[in-house]
Amino acid sequence: MERIHELDSLTFSDMLRQGSVSLSKDKNAINDLNVFPIPDGDTGDNMLMTLKAGCATMKDHLGTLSEMAQAASSGMLLGARGNSGVILSRIFAGLAKGLQGLIIADTNAFAKAMDAAVTEAYKAVPVPVEGTIITVLREGAAGADASGDLNHYLETLLEAMQVSLDHTPELLQVLKDAGVVDSGGAGLLSIFRGMNDALNGNITAEEIESTVTLSTPTVELNKFDENSTLEFGYCTEFLLRLMRSKVDVDTFDETEIFDYLNRVGDSVVAFREGTIVKVHVHTFKPGEILNYCQQFGEFLTLKIENMTLQHHQTVNQNNASFKVPPKKYGVVTVASGEGLVNAFHEIGADEVIAGGQTMNPSTQDFIEAFGRINAQHILVFPNNKNIKMAADQAAELYKNADIHVLPSTTIGEGYYGIGSIDRDNPDAEEVIASVTEIMQSVVTGMVSTAIRDAEGDQVSVHTGDYVGYSGKQLLSDSPNRKEAASALVKRLDAASRDVMLVFFGEGVPQDEAEQLVAELTETYKNLEIMLNNGTQPVYDYIFVLC
């Protein structure tokens, strides 16, 4: 086997792609490293989709090691899903920073880049918790030996990561109680195992498919003929590489482009990542925008769609009138299930991103949702702790409105929070403070199917049973779904509340839900109960008490 002393761009690309292959094989086992007996955010899936987004950005990209690392980082930044995916994207952002300006990297240079990855990963977490992915990264980098070739460095890195991963239950009691190691750390170890395989020449032929590439839409050409009128303009998207032959890349102020786009277009989403400017804009004259932007660089990708032609195939918000004054507040939230989505729209949400407990939206999903809202302030309700980091990352990248990510961790908090927004109050901070206070008074309980045995507060949970819980508290368990639901409502102290919303899920017959509500109404005579068909996955019932 050839020993590698210097890392070039092609080898780095192979390493990341093989890391994706390795993680793809291990993702189900990683998903099963779940400390909670309810289907969770699927760490393996989130990390894999994030890594694939980076691999997709690198595809067919020829450049230096530095440029390749930056391309991967940019793709992961936008494709990041779930907390584990966001942290992974920041790890590779740090690695890219450490490799910045390098055509090749020897062992010492790569080791320093790994140290930069550690620093960036810890910055991504407001309150770092040891015993997680960041610990495995830090202790792995600290234990790796950079005195030899890259093969030796990766081998010792993997050894140190494995030791660290095995030790995570000693750092987090919740892992020890569940008898598992940290899932994010396991995912990271799998990625670096694949990277090590590639470095040693063990590259599989498995195709790495992108999870972020958009499919080509079906176009009904008869919807726009020779007698039609262009009502909605063109949806124009492109990636522009700033070129040193045209501008001083290091000092160029991208707001020159952003200000121009806001003058001539609508629904602008534009941001810069390194030397790449990503643009989404609605305009009647895409040619003028392309000509203007080309004076600063060259296009990497380009897509123009006739929105009048797409009128019958796209959502209503893409057809909004141009050049209308922005409203004060816009709202973005996250939910799954047609009934829940409709409920959020009815209560005042402008955009409901498809997602939730086991389907975490990406940073890109949030950015695109922001771009479809014409508002000064956009309030974001993630409704899940595992979604908030992607929302926060999107908020940092988006520059065309003030984005406020609120601390909603449940469907109930998001629902009541959105419904309480005082849209006539000009003071955004007052509005946010009021909404946050109201959300804190909301209690949300869910019923789902247990995927493992567990011990909770006064309840033993058995695999396959229906389990009622609130936050991370296990409150009821029964083989009978209705019994588990009734016991949960009692544990939530429904008798002390005034109103309870009940959303029943996609697998629950309506007559069962109606019977449950009838029984609860008889038991809690002073409680106003409202039943809704949420059609949500994962949760058989969602109870929201206020």
Annotate each language-model stretch with its function.
Residues 1-546:
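N-terminal loops that bind phosphate or other acidic moieties
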